[in-house]
Design a protein with these regions (language model features):
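Crotonase-fold acyl-CoA enzyme core
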Residues: 1-110, 142, 146-150, 156
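Helix-loop "lid/cap" segments that line or gate small-molecule binding pockets
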Residues: 64-65, 116-119, 134-140
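Short beta-strand->loop
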Residues: 124-129
Length: 164
């Protein structure tokens, strides 16, 4: 249930930028850079524009797509294209840390949460809140959610039944 989390050490030009934007999470080295540079050669990066406008604020996506300029990893993180930026030697360890953090959570909640996030994204506000309420109600019936509430009340760490 862990989302695909790519890592990027170097340059992500249109195709790689497209692939990174499609992922729900990403980790990059401080040396990484991103561009949709097709416009520099007379070709608007139409395909990369689809995930970019779904993952970046429209103004940042528009600037990347219309200028073809590179952005560095820190800018990509500030704009929401990557989650974390670390020095290249720490890239694998940081990715492992992120994956481990997700795997240590109750996997039923992770699966339900991911499914709800994907579905609600294309819904109107009211429908999204309805789905969120339904998901929360179903999630609260799960033994791990009940264990989490009990652990919170007892001021202890939860003992998940289904850790990865």
């Amino acid at each position: 249930p862990v989302p695909g989390i790519p890592r990027l050490r170097g340059m992500a030009t249109p195709w790689m930028c497209h692939r990174r934007a499609q992922c729900r999470m990403a980790v990059a080295s401080t040396e990484a850079s991103f561009a949709t540079s097709g416009i520099n050669y007379g070709l608007f990066c139409s395909t990369p524009s689809v995930p970019l406008v779904r993952n970046l604020p429209i103004k940042q996506a528009m600037e990347m797509l219309l200028t073809g300029d590179f952005i560095d990893a820190q800018t990509a993180q500030a704009q929401g294209l990557v989650n974390r930026v670390v020095a290249a030697p720490s890239l694998d360890a940081e990715l492992d840390k992120l994956v481990t953090a997700i795997l240590q959570k109750p996997q039923t909640a992770v699966r339900m949460g991911k499914a709800m996030l994907y579905r609600q994204r294309e819904m109107g506000l009211e429908a999204a809140y309805q789905l969120a309420g339904q998901t929360m109600a179903l999630n609260m019936m799960d033994a791990d959610a009940q264990e989490g509430a009990q652990a919170f009340a007892e001021k202890r760490l939860p003992a998940w039944r289904d850790p990865s």
